[in-house]
Curated annotation (Swiss-Prot):
Alphabetized PROSITE patterns for the sequence: SAM_CHO2
Low complexity bias: start-end ranges: 36-45
Enzyme kind, highest EC tier: transferase
UniProt gene name: chol-1
Record's protein name: Phosphatidylethanolamine N-methyltransferase
Cytoplasmic topological domain residue ranges: 113-115, 223-229, 301-306, 411-417, 489-496, 595-965
Residue span of region Disordered: 1-55
Family: Belongs to the class VI-like SAM-binding methyltransferase superfamily. CHO2 family.
Main location: endoplasmic reticulum
């Protein structure tokens, strides 16, 4: 949130304060002794204090721009349990439901309690993650909760005569005003704020019952393990209480920072006009309320000494992470991190990341390789696996060989030792061997010089290095997994000893390492993952995002957690030593390879302390801080002495390689809104389909007619008089409809493929979001956006009925992004009974035929022709949105293209059918403008020209002259 919008209020209130203070000061100097002036002074001072207090008030803004004072509210525990807080009917209902939980835990038979409370807790957990998640999702996307409140007139004053339920209005008014005695009037508050307050009461019930049912389930399952000693019992309870206390502190500190506004997802309804400051626990871990904020679950599991409680805690925690990923993160991205405005001028097109140009330095007659597109064929991830690439083939084959050998060899001590030594060798090569190569590359560009020596380019050196590093990384971890498999023994009894707990903790550590690696890759991108700044002079600035916001070197702490997890699961000395060696080698790599290079490249731009370090330093008492500073001073002096002695002065602080390539976490709008099939409406009597009609208008395709190609019989070559309309791929289509004046306000028009429906009377398939209602305000979703005109009287041409007309536009996600033959269907009354069908029309992508155009695709003229043909298609694919679609060939695409993969998929589909070139969607993201895409298309067509079937681009057989007779 930005504070700029709040500045006018602050400026106005501050001016009131400034105007009153001089008056009070002058009065006290001139007539200080009089009681009258003292009273004036006190009155003016109180006014100044009141103004100052108004300055501190929080202001909110609704989506329509309404600004209001956000009153102070209290958390649910205080509202429910503090006797000093006023109570109302909803509080009594919540407390009564909680009391029922306690009564059930006390009176039910012992054998019923455990499964019953497990089911009760899972019910409330689903109500939280699924129920609240669904409500928040539809509110974020469609403002549907506010729409429902408006439709049901929940907050409409009964005095207007428009509220059908005055009793409900009075109940809500009493409920909400009782809780907020200051700065709040039910009648004057925006509907978004009142809706949020009502939503809060539902959340209070779910959250309280969720927590209470979990605690009662833990109490029901609690027991003392057989044979547990006093020391172990004390340690278990001490650790559990510590985790619960830590959990309590996390929740309280998080609430201190975000207040009720973020605690109850207020930004789904309105925004507050002030800067967001995240300190305290928010510097300790990402999403602390969902990550370390659930530490208490595991503390309670320890105190209960129950695996049932532990497993249900893990399930609940996983469900909470799913809630975060599916519900909260998309809304956070949309609200606080919108795509950057599109760059209007592409002045840097030829210079941006020029070091990558050599990767595509192939011979060309254009000589324009200064504007070469970026490489896009990434290595990391299963989605990038390519069996036409030698690195991927080698990794798959070697891992397959390793897996086969692991499975077929016996688990004798000889083979176990052999596999452990094999894994150790790969670990040494991965950390020490590659570390030496990177050190020499940093100091004297050794790796690059080797390829330049044989006439290769810097890009070739970079590609080969990525392959070596990727292969080494995969084989290092695969060999460790194979060694762990050889040393693992399946437990004969999972309930004996610590067998089950070791597996749970071990798998958690492995998951932690996987998450850490994923976060690092998302932050650094492919360039940083493969240490690109060792090969190229990077001009990027260090930015600390994602996991690097909290840790300078996440690999130091969490990067080897999976090794210790495997050691815990296998419970093997050899694997433990392997984990120890791997951790030590990782620390050595960071200290002796990465840190010196980072110091040399980024220098003073390196950050001193990460978020966790800052938090710990601020939390220490002053004596400890002074002692720590003195120790640091002694260590620094000793370190400098040693560094000077060995002539290897290096910085004390270490940071991770933080060269950032843009975050490609795109939000995929994969599942559009859909309509549910319904029965034929019974109120069709009196509606004649002949009074309904649809007509279309759109951008027609300009090109040759290919329907008569000379391959038909002579009679079939005659073109028909009535031509089917053909519109451009992705171009908006305007639909004009006609209907009787008394038509249903819930009528709607949908777009379908002609072959999707067998019946002409009833539509048989869902519209999948490709529909627009005829009248606004009749449906809850955002379908009204396509309505242009509705219910305009039509000049009367027949005496039997009065007609009205309207107009709507289908664009963006309401279109089919494929070629084919389509039709619009007019439906009656919110159902699927068809009243009218438009004439069929085609969606076409005109082919770019350089042969008939007489254009040399390998020349600059050819590139310009491709640009001219490609630009309107790209604009259609990007919805013709000025914030996304370029106006010329040099302008970059908008930031939405990186966020939402649908745009890139539209573009590559169009290029495939227009030019016959199949690109990956990542190519569109890397090129970023039409000019680079045109260059890539021309280059691809030039390379593929010898394999083309056309005469101008080459022949399939080397025929240079006619056959001799």
């Amino acid at each position: 949130m930005s504070s700029s919008a709040a500045d006018p209020f602050a400026a106005r209130l501050n001016s009131d304060v400034r105007q009153r203070h001089p008056t009070a000061s002058a009065t006290s100097k001139n007539v200080e002794g009089t009681s009258q002036q003292k009273q004036q002074q006190q009155q003016q001072q109180s006014e100044a204090n009141a103004a100052a207090s108004r300055v501190k008030k929080t202001y909110g803004k609704t989506p329509d721009g309404t600004v209001f004072v956000v009153p102070t509210t209290h958390d649910m525990v205080t509202q429910l349990l503090d006797p000093r807080e006023p109570k109302n009917l909803s509080d009594v209902a919540v407390l009564a439901i909680i009391a029922l939980h306690f009564l059930a835990a006390y009176y039910l038979p012992w054998g019923v309690k455990r499964p019953l409370f497990a089911a009760i807790f899972m019910f409330w957990r689903l109500a939280y993650n699924v129920g609240i998640g669904y409500l928040l999702t539809i509110q974020s996307k469609y403002k549907l909760l506010v729409t429902w409140a408006k439709r049901w007139k929940l907050f409409e004053n009964p005095a207007t005569g428009k509220n059908p339920r005055p009793w409900l209005y009075n109940l809500l008014k009493k409920e909400l005003e009782t809780k907020i005695p200051q700065d709040y009037k039910f009648e004057e508050a925006p509907i978004e704020y009142n809706t949020w307050l009502t939503f809060r009461r539902v959340v209070d019930l779910i959250l309280m019952c969720d927590f209470i049912s979990y605690c009662l389930f833990a109490i029901v399952c609690a027991h003392k393990p057989d044979g547990e000693g006093l020391f172990m019992c004390f340690a278990r309870w001490a650790a559990g209480i510590t985790l619960v206390g830590f959990n309590l502190w996390v929740k309280l500190d998080a609430h201190r920072v975000v207040k009720d506004y973020a605690w109850y997802w207020g930004d789904f309804f309105y925004l507050i006009e002030q800067e967001l400051t995240f300190d305290g626990v928010f510097e300790l871990a990402p999403h602390p309320m969902y990550s370390i904020g659930y530490a208490g679950y595991y503390g309670i599991s320890m105190m209960a000494a129950s695996y049932d409680v532990l497993f249900i805690s893990i399930i609940a925690h996983a469900a909470q992470f799913a809630f975060l990923v599916i519900v909260e993160n998309p809304h956070i991205e949309k609200t606080y991190n919108p795509p950057q405005p599109r760059v209007r001028c592409e002045s840097e097109a030829g210079s941006q990341l020029q070091e990558f140009a050599s990767e595509y330095s192939v011979p060309s007659t254009t000589g324009r390789h200064d504007n070469t597109p970026l490489p896009v064929h990434n290595l990391i991830g299963l989605k990038n696996l390519d069996f036409f690439r030698i690195t991927d083939v080698a990794i798959v084959l070697l891992c397959a060989y390793l897996a086969v050998v692991t499975m077929v060899t016996p688990n004798t001590r000889f083979y176990q030792a052999l596999f452990v030594l094999h894994a150790l060798a790969w670990r040494l090569w991965y950390s020490a061997g590659l570390g030496v190569i990177l050190t020499m590359q940093s100091e004297e560009k050794m790796f690059t010089r080797h390829f330049l020596k044989y006439g290769e380019s810097v890009g070739e050196a970079w590609r080969q290095w990525k392959g070596i590093y990727h292969l080494s990384n995969c084989l290092c971890h695969a060999s460790f997994i194979a060694a762990s498999y050889k040393m693992y023994e399946f437990p004969a009894d999972w309930t004996y000893g610590w067998a089950l707990l070791k597996h749970v903790v071990g798998l958690s550590l492995i998951a932690l390492q996987v998450w850490t690696a994923t976060s690092i890759y998302e932050s650094l991108g492919e360039f940083g993952w493969f240490y690109g700044d060792f090969f190229f002079d990077s001009k990027r600035q260090l930015t600390y995002t994602s996991i690097y916001r909290f840790l300078n070197n996440p690999e130091r702490v969490f990067g080897t957690a999976g090794l210790w997890g495997a050691a815990l699961i296998t419970w093997s000395r050899a694997i433990f030593l392997m984990a120890l060696a791997g951790h030590f080698l990782t620390l050595a790599f960071l200290a002796y390879v990465e840190k010196p290079h980072m110091q040399k490249v980024y220098g003073r731009n390196l950050r001193d302390d990460a978020g966790v370090t800052k938090f710990i330093k601020r939390s220490l008492p002053p004596p400890v801080t002074e002692w720590q500073q003195s120790i640091d001073k002694v260590l620094d002096e000793t370190k400098h002495f040693i560094d000077e002695f060995v002539d290897a002065a290096r910085s004390r602080l270490a940071t991770g390689s933080s060269t950032i390539v843009k975050d490609t976490s795109a939000l995929f709008n994969k599942y559009p809104a859909r309509l549910t099939l319904s029965k034929i409406s019974p109120d069709l009597a009196g509606y004649d389909p002949k009074h309904y009609g649809l007509s279309l208008a759109g951008t027609r395709v300009v090109g040759t007619n290919e329907k008569a190609t000379g391959k038909e019989s002579p009679n079939a070559r005659v073109l028909k008089d009535v031509k089917t309309q053909a519109f451009e791929y992705g171009a908006p289509i305007r639909v004009k409809w006609t209907a009787p004046a008394n038509h249903s306000k819930k009528d709607w028009v949908g777009l379908y493929m002609v072959t999707d429906n067998r019946s002409r009377e009833v539509t048989e398939v869902p519209s999948l979001g490709r529909w627009v209602p005829t009248n606004p305000g009749e449906y809850d979703t955002t379908t009204d956006q396509g309505i242009l005109v509705w219910d305009q009287p039509v000049e009367k041409k027949s005496e039997d009925t009065d007609l009205v007309e309207g107009e709507m536009v289908f664009e963006g996600d309401k279109l089919w992004w494929t070629q084919g033959v389509f039709e619009f269907r007019y439906h009656h009354g919110g159902g699927h009974h068809v009243m009218s069908i438009s004439e069929p029309f085609e969606i076409q992508i005109p082919k770019f035929d350089d042969e008939h155009m007489g254009v040399d695709i390998s020349g600059e003229v050819g590139e310009r022709a491709v640009e001219a043909a490609l630009l309107p298609v790209i604009r259609n694919c990007l919805d013709r949105d000025p914030d996304i679609a370029p106006s010329n060939a040099e302008e970059r695409f908008g930031g939405h293209v990186e966020r939402d993969g649908k745009y890139a998929r539209r573009v590559v589909y169009a290029i495939r059918h227009m030019f016959g070139i199949d690109f990956a969607p990542a190519v569109v993201l890397a090129d970023g403008n039409v000019r680079r895409l045109a260059w890539r298309i021309c280059h691809a067509k030039e390379v593929l020209a010898p394999f083309s079937m056309s005469h101008t681009n080459g022949r399939t057989t080397p025929v240079d002259s006619k056959f001799s007779e």
